[in-house]
């Protein structure tokens, strides 16, 4: 996770939790002159559109005061959904035995894109079974990770 994203998580965690939600994670996507700050919130009951709107208002107020992003950006707030993005060791740990897709910064076993079953998490290392091969991936090498939903 980049330094700005870490700062944003620290800044926005408390306001989201004050609403009774958990800050599942966030993505800051730079797209030319305009950027997107995407927050994922969750709770045990599920997230509804009203929850997203309320969190958006709360987060906007904090962002206006703190002003951590100097360029124009769009704030998006949503639930993680069924193909939820995974950001932390704890989140990967919760999905041991499930299939995930990860995009890597640096290749592992010759690939930057892996799809496999989470077999464990050891500190900041993800154990992943890909086509019968056990791979170890550093969490800081994961650019993006998502749970693959089963239907």
UniProtKB/Swiss-Prot annotation:
User: What Pfam families is this protein classified in?
Assistant: DUF150_C (PF17384), RimP_N (PF02576)
Annotated localization? Cytoplasm
GO CC terms? cytosol
Listed GO biological process terms:
ribosomal small subunit assembly; translation
Q: Which InterPro entries match?
A: Ribosome_maturation_RimP, RimP_C, RimP_C_sf, RimP_N, RimP_N_sf
Asked whether the keyword Cytoplasm is assigned, the reply is: yes
Membership in a protein family: Belongs to the RimP family.
Q: Which HAMAP family match?
A: RimP
Q: What is this protein called?
A: Ribosome maturation factor RimP
Organism field: Shewanella pealeana (strain ATCC 700345 / ANG-SQ1)
Gene that encodes the chain: rimP
């Amino acid at each position: 996770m980049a330094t700005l994203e870490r700062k944003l998580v620290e800044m926005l965690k408390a306001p989201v939790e004050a609403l009774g939600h958990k800050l599942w994670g966030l993505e800051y996507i730079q797209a030319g002159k305009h950027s997107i700050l995407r927050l994922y919130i969750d709770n045990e009951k599920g997230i509804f559109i009203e929850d997203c709107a309320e969190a958006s208002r709360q987060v906007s107020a904090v962002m206006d005061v703190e002003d951590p992003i100097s360029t124009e950006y769009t704030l998006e707030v949503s639930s993680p959904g069924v193909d939820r993005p995974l950001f932390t060791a704890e989140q990967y740990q919760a999905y041991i035995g499930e299939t995930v897709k990860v995009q890597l910064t640096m290749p592992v076993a010759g690939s930057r894109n892996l799809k496999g079953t989470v077999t464990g998490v050891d500190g900041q290392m993800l154990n992943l079974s890909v086509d019968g091969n056990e791979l170890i991936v550093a969490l800081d090498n994961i650019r993006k990770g998502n749970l693959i939903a089963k239907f």
